[in-house]
Amino acid sequence: MTICSCEETINEFEMLTRDAARVQKDTLKKILEINASAEYLQNFGLGGRTDAESYKSCIPLCVHNDIEPYIQRIVDGDTSPVVTGEPITNLSLSSGTTHGKPKFIPFNDELLETTLQIYRTSYAFRNREYPIGQGKALQFVYGSKQVITKGGILATTATTNLYRRQRYKEGMKDIQSQCCSPDEVIFGPDFHQSLYCHLLCGLIYSEEVHSVFSTFAHSLVHAFQTFEEVWEDLCTDIRDGVLSKKVTAPSIREAVSKILKPNPELADSIYKKCIGLSNWYGVIPALWPNAKYVYGIMTGSMEPYLKKLRHYAGNLPLISADYGASEGWVGSNIDPTVPPEQVTYAVLPQVGYFEFIPLEKPIGEETENSASIHYIESDPVGLTEVEVGKIYEVVITNFAGLYRYRLGDVVKIARFHNSTPELQFICRRSLVLSINIDKNTEKDLQLAVEEASKFLEGEKLEVMDFTSFVERSSDPGRYVIFWELSGDASDEVLSSCANALDLAFIDAGYTGSRKIKTIGPLELRILRKGTFKEILDHFLSLGGAVSQFKTPRFVNPSNSKVLQILSRNVTQSYFSTAYGF
């Protein structure tokens, strides 16, 4: 993409957002026209109408369970217009990391186009601040296994649905985001071999790399933790021009061997830089001197990885990628200079039809920083009707058969850009920890871990990763928090951490229940190093893609395999005494 076309993209964005209400009206009309024959819409009596008033009065708000019977028919091979006018030929699989069961979500060419619109917009603003010109991107991206459903529909992750399309590849060329690695590495049969070769290809093209990317911050941190373990092997491969025997997949070996040539000078340079680093601080700019930034989704459940990612990135800016889900895109990051913790997303009014359910916390019940699930809901409002400073749940209508679909995301309106809102992601609304009247979300858990981990700072330790579980086999039930640490901590410190975790859950339902002993003392369980990598491997064995993996912050009892992995890796256990028992 030239600077000129970046300007054109920004100008188009400015034009569309100046008249967001009209664009929303036109977008809904377009969606309803092309899907007028859909059984789902007809069942609710829409009758071909395309205006917002008729649409909202006929079609109810929904969650995935409501539309699952329709999608299951598509999975089973029903080619009639079930949720869209044209038959659905591809399905995306959501991650399924919490419950162990992925969801099927319809995918079509229109969703591909909205993806490219989102990417082009954020790239244009990014390139204005950090121009990259010609070059390559070190991308830790991975395809996943494709499955054919009973009805002959191709199902895979949303990212793989993109990577396998020629139109997507062309779009990535336009925005200077070509991956260093050949397709055979991206679609390799073994994640560990693909990761190794991503690192290798990145080093081979180290002078040409202008950006470092993965879908999620977790994948970036995992990549460089792996680099710490294999960097000497990578140097040997580059010095000798021979790919390590640990890469056994023929497709990967053949593709990477074509670009791997003996280069002792480069190997020596990498070796000297690595041994000169202090605890791997700034490894990314040291080895990729022309990289302008590190890019990926860094909000929500990815925030706990930012500290480690900043360590690897040194002085390079971290830029949070765009806001969306497998169900569809919402907004672009148009201010890449803002740190991830403060990032906002401008909603693109042409990529879907958006509504927002106003959420209010009961007066006096919640503290300012609590992300509790307690909310009073009002009727949904339109994109241009939201108010700055207020919080909402996002509702999306997309081009692929989701109508008034509740995403379950809580957002705050930070400001308006022209007439479209800029959203700040607050948390997933879904409940994580609950025993009786207590209600805590993923954000509450994250805040509790941040607070309790301060006790580790004196021993220069950090929480590498964490998750949680509700233990109901005892009476009363209790919260169980699992930590994987960077090293060994004393019993005294970990006991303090357990108490701090217990006290950090400030939801009134929790504190009241603890005081009257209807919830038992919180338990902190310490895990062996490598436990979360084992959970990742389990996820991959189910056909998931690492670029889609999110550590489950809460493990549902139905996810027995992950619970088994956690249980057999517990090395120490500490019960809170914060409430005196």
Swiss-Prot record:
Enzyme class at the top of the EC tree: ligase
The residues the record assigns to binding ATP are 92, 115, 161, 324-329, 561
Q: Among the record's GO biological process terms, what is one? A: response to auxin
Where on this chain does jasmonate bind? 95, 321-324, 326
Q: What induces it?
A: At low level by auxin. Induced by methyl jasmonate (MeJA), red light, far-red light and blue light. Induced by wounding and infection by the rice blast fungus Magnaporthe oryzae. Induced by elicitors from oral secretions of armyworm caterpillars (Spodoptera mauritia).
Annotated EC: 6.3.2.52
* Keywords per UniProt: ATP-binding, Developmental protein, Growth regulation, Jasmonic acid signaling pathway, Ligase, Nucleotide-binding, Plant defense, Stress response
What is the documented function of this protein? Answer: Catalyzes the synthesis of jasmonate-amino acid conjugates by adenylation. Catalyzes the conjugation of jasmonate (JA) to Ile when expressed in a heterologous system (E.coli). Catalyzes in vitro the conjugation of jasmonate (JA) to Ile, Phe, Cys, Leu, Met, Ala, Val and Trp. Involved in the production of JA-Ile in response to infection by the rice blast fungus Magnaporthe oryzae. Required for the accumulation of the flavonoid phytoalexin sakuranetin in response to infection by the rice blast fungus. Involved in herbivory-induced JA-Ile accumulation.
Stored PANTHER family: GH3 DOMAIN-CONTAINING PROTEIN, JASMONOYL--L-AMINO ACID SYNTHETASE JAR1
Mind telling me what this protein is named? Jasmonoyl--L-amino acid synthetase GH3.5
The UniProt gene name for this protein comes to GH3.5
